Amino acid sequence: MGHIGLTPQTLSRLGGYRVQGKTAAAATGLLADALALEEVGCYALVLEAMPAPVATAITERIGIPTLGIGAGPGCDGQVLVFHDVLGLYDRVNPRFVKEYANLRAIILNAFAAYRDDVVAGRFPADEHTYPMDEAAAAEFQAALRDGAAG
């Protein structure tokens, strides 16, 4: 699978999320890259962070499926990273991200409550532990006293 436009390798070099293919020359370059990747045998192509008309033109001109991530509706399929869908990041999202839930706050609250319960001795409680038959427990304690167990 090929990947053009914004790629993980270019993020730091570009200084973060930057749209690719905004000029005619850059858009033509992306099309050339797409055709070259198809030619070398890519079975599909991710088009990331590019203007929708550029992604649509690429999709119309290559014979392999395109998956868009911030590339508009003209691709054959869409990608949205699950961390973004669920709102797990505490940061400003790229323009193409639509957050469907804010689980970050829920998750942080859950871990804080867990920590508080452990520190206060409320977890684990009896209902969270496995019991032992009284006779077996007494036999085990006797074995410990006799030095039979370790």
Residue ranges and their predicted role:
Residues 1-95, 101, 105-150:
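Alpha/beta enzyme core
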